Amino acid sequence: MRIIKYLTILVISVVILTSCQSSSSQESTKSGEFRIVPTTVALTMTLDKLDLPIVGKPTSYKTLPNRYKDVPEIGQPMEPNVEAVKKLKPTHVLSVSTIKDEMQPFYKQLNMKGYFYDFDSLKGMQKSITQLGDQFNRKAQAKELNDHLNSVKQKIENKAAKQKKHPKVLILMGVPGSYLVATDKSYIGDLVKIAGGENVIKVKDRQYISSNTENLLNINPDIILRLPHGMPEEVKKMFQKEFKQNDIWKHFKAVKNNHVYDLEEVPFGITANVDADKAMTQLYDLFYKDKK
């Protein structure tokens, strides 16, 4: 009987201790004691808007929020340094769904759960903002940010709907040495649609496709957008050289009418970001600058 009584007391004690530890852990989480490491610039900028501290940040030539200036770098978004991240003792390491497959080995080495967010479109990013707000106790900030983006989007869509003619747009996404054509499934394609442009590329199952200038000439867009990704100045020079040396471009209506525009990585980009309000506004102004 004494043994049974002793075991009963021991079990109760363990349950109480475990309960207390669980409660303490929940309180810690509720108080916002997260150690967050975003692995992409877009996520870093979003966390700043949600007023969240971070313990690690991606290595980037882009300017990150000043509040994170003393935060340690953890490497490139596609190749974060496992040991550098481990040293930070993170509770959450964040990435985007676009590179989920590529990031799985990284999370396996960390022995941590991967958190992936959709930044492929404005709608996807807004859903991710809500998820981040719920996850890190920033619901009010997430709602405020999404309300602002919705307001700008609605305003742009309403103005575009009143236009009698919508420009046909070709979007070129350049990297050093080459370029691809963006479809509606890409983030920039999504923005073009919101701003009242019609993407001349109708592919539905891919974000980007390889280019064929002869086929593009047959489509003959009203506007050509050139978006750099990585080393923007080098990519701009590449585009200028391509359009100057490849004789076929001079036959494009957009080139003849000087409707070829180089977009900046900020506020644009290949993934959605919190500067989407500025990007939508700039695109609308480009498309309808003669209609004001």
From Swiss-Prot:
The organism's place on the tree of life at top rank: Bacteria
Cofactor: heme b
Gene: isdE
Membrane association type: Lipid-anchor
NCBIfam families: IsdE
One Pfam family matching this protein: Peripla_BP_2
Name of the protein this chain belongs to: High-affinity heme uptake system protein IsdE
Function comment: Involved in heme (porphyrin) scavenging. Binds Fe(2+) and Fe(3+) heme but the largest fraction is Fe(2+) heme. Functions as a high-affinity heme binding protein and probably has a role in relaying heme-iron from cell wall-anchored isd proteins receptors to the probable permease IsdF.
Species: Staphylococcus aureus (strain N315)
